[in-house]
């Protein structure tokens, strides 16, 4: 496993994931329109307005949007690592869960 894959394993929260997504876009040096066009060349949908909303609002992207974005940015070999990071972030933000917590924790009386 290389450094990039290890770094992606460190991502645990939606905020961490979103920060890394913004950094990925910056490293790509591509505009939202260029990213949308790159995805379209591969037969994928990557609406630039949706992508901009996700990166601006810090929300978790849908898995298919995340995969298309990662490939468009040139990190296609890490799609599975990104999707695993997204899954961890989604689980961490699920109701009744928190960092280090578990579902159903907390007393009922």
Residue ranges and their predicted role:
Residues 1-30, 37, 44-46, 58-109:
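Short amphipathic recognition helices of helix-turn-helix/homeodomain-type DNA-binding modules
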